[in-house]
A protein has these predicted regions:
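Disulfide-stabilized extracellular recognition modules
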Residues: 51-104
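Short, surface-exposed glycine/acidic/tryptophan-bearing loops
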Residues: 6-54, 73
């Protein structure tokens, strides 16, 4: 189920990945701290990131061709999702994609 809170948090993370393309945040903490900072209750969580794809179809194709990203997408234990794309004309990859999954 698309979740407004997770979508808002994925917006934060996609913007952060334009600064540091990593599952770590620019402050050095794990990506999951964005959930804790905003009091998201969950028992399991995952993150997919991508950069450079200029359409949703292109990024989904790449994620589905990556075993670890595909596993997150297909994992039926996750019941909430947030997805976003941040565009920065001055960043190396221009397009920065984010998926957040949780089991709430």
């Amino acid at each position: 189920t698309k979740d407004t809170t997770l979508t808002n948090l994925s917006n934060i993370r996609s913007k952060e990945t334009a600064t540091l393309f990593s599952h770590q945040r620019p402050d050095g903490t794990s990506w999951s701290t964005v959930l804790k900072q905003h009091n998201v209750s969950y028992t399991s969580a995952a993150e997919n990131i991508a950069a450079g794809q200029n359409t949703p179809e292109a990024v989904v194709k790449e994620w589905m061709n990556s075993p670890s990203h595909r596993a997150n997408i297909m994992n039926s234990k996750y019941n909430k999702i947030g997805v976003s794309c941040y565009v920065d004309q001055n960043a190396p990859y221009r397009y920065y994609w984010e998926q957040l999954f949780i089991k709430g």
